[in-house]
Amino acid sequence: MEQYLEFRIDEQTTELKMEAFLKKNAGLTKRQISQAKFRPDGITRNGVRCRVTETIYPGDVICVCLEEAGTASAHLENYNDGIRSKDLSDFHSNRASAPVSETSFSLNILYEDTDILAVDKPAGMVTHPTGMHYTDSLSNLVAGYFREKNEQVCVRPVGRLDQETSGIVVFAKNQVAASRLQSVKSPCKIHKQYLAAVSGTLPVDMPGVWHTLDLPLMQDPENHLKMKTAADLSLHSSALSGKIKTAVTHYHTLFSSQDWSLITLKLDTGRTHQIRVHMASTGHPLLGDTLYHSDDKISSCASFSRAALHAWKVSFQHPFRDEMLLLEAPLPFDFRELVSLSGSDLLSI
């Protein structure tokens, strides 16, 4: 299956080499550019095949042919949560070795086209197959879905959600879409907005008002399952300095009661447990989050038996079309039950 990308160089673009444009502006990898060079009419400028060393100018029309059929698995590395994931579930839907899903969950599809699949992950399900969840991950469900449709697709989740977190997960259906959606330099980078219920009372914010938490994180040296803020660690240790990662969270309070508050969050970075650690550091941990708060009252609030976090909305430019996609996952049952206790009309948010 061939994919074509077309770009019209605007008047504000300064003269630059074709290869530099394809890397910086088109978000293509060195490997993808190299593969395109050797295809007939793989890279053209104004309809004429050209070299990547040529200079492009304002007004030029660039077309790149990117081929998926016959290529090997992308072997992409996932940096979404600040950890290089070697177990990215990049198995093929028609491959005999791809484990069959053994879960009672059904796949809730929010959006699908020839390049992208977006689904609503339930809380309690892992995104990628792991040793303990080799056949009951979200990726297993997606592989089974493609297999039933007789679609030969490599399963490539773009980022991941923690097991306890519900909400939107985007899957790329081809190698090029995956690299464009995952690249931090690409205009197609996915922007997520989360919904969380936290302990305690936070002042409700006016529209457009956001609060920023700029707290670097690293793995807790005493518990590898947890993350900690740099403020909790010795910054004078050279052994730790290289392990500390920048982490920036923005939050906005939608509703507040005497015991809990409903907030929405956006991330500049995507570190492991970033929202959970940052909110715990403010004294307002997520309801149900026993890993970062041991108070029994927190875990027993309403019906939350998990960290109250939901990947609510995503927005991104389509990797092959001049179209902005805005997707939203409905509130899961535990969030709806909690919101109903507030007596406010928050279900319409």
Language-model regions, residue ranges each:
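RNA pseudouridine synthases
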Residues: M1-I349
